[in-house]
Amino acid sequence: MSSLRLRLCLLLLLPITISCVTVTLTDLPAFREAPAFRNGRECSKTTWIPSDHEHNPSIIHIAMTLDAIYLRGSVAGVFSVLQHASCPENIVFHFIATHRRSADLRRIISSTFPYLTYHIYHFDPNLVRSKISSSIRRALDQPLNYARIYLADLLPIAVRRVIYFDSDLVVVDDVAKLWRIDLRRHVVGAPEYCHANFTNYFTSRFWSSQGYKSALKDRKPCYFNTGVMVIDLGKWRERRVTVKLETWMRIQKRHRIYELGSLPPFLLVFAGDVEPVEHRWNQHGLGGDNLEGLCRNLHPGPVSLLHWSGKGKPWLRLDSRRPCPLDSLWAPYDLFRYSPLISDS
């Protein structure tokens, strides 16, 4: 539901007076203003200009999507990044949103993070709507879930490297550590989980086709979660990765070769060809599975990023007063104030 502006007038007697006020009906939540985060002494203060074609390695670029349903998670994610960053003023956020809500979302981001350097890019849902087939969970079928495929087209050429974050995670370490990883010859860096059973990701039709399954021949069976990726956008553009991903999406639309939304095309293009990142940078699956969203425990080892991938989202479970134990780790980053039906304008 879009915001709706109404003019309400009240008739007051003795003497007769008509008093009017403009209100806005909205389905977007309100948030507390985040504190200003400043650079440490070791940081060189820089300003990023989108029209500048020179690459500045001291600026960290982070891309996320923005929409009404996951807005609370996105705000918490941004807050967590800034709170733990050594050079927060050198971080530029690139938000991807559909045109329908971009003005409202811009207002919320600006009021919640007055000191944030950010840009909002319009994503046309029609770009992927005809290429999406239904999956095991409705949230995985939303067009904005596929926006990560088009980052190289949406972001300026000057952005040669970007970190992509999902909207259901919080960072509990300095994001500069993730930014500095050496991608070497690879397009994408992400925590990898090898010895995966790929039969679980693709249908029998895929495995019965010599042409389809040959795409994975001689490839290491390595799974990676696409909610946390470091991407070399220059190499992505050179190797026409978007076209390759779209090709698999079109095949899926005709022959249904997988069930899991936007992940399988990434596996078909990148499996076994990803720069491994420490597992601490994506403690994923905290939202449980895609069907029930049951509580999960942390994986063994150190943690730099907590990711509530899966059906269960921490803000929904906290609001329902049925949180999982690990949801308490997300709560300190929640800037949610209230969800008004009517707000003054």
Swiss-Prot record:
One of its GO terms (molecular function) is polygalacturonate 4-alpha-galacturonosyltransferase activity. It is found in: Golgi apparatus membrane. The keyword Transmembrane applies. Pathway: Glycan metabolism; pectin biosynthesis. The keyword Metal-binding does not apply. SUPFAM superfamilies: Nucleotide-diphospho-sugar transferases. Signal peptide: none annotated. GO terms for biological process: cell wall organization; pectin biosynthetic process. Residues 29-345 are lumenal. Belongs to the glycosyltransferase 8 family. May be involved in pectin and/or xylans biosynthesis in cell walls. This is Probable galacturonosyltransferase-like 3.
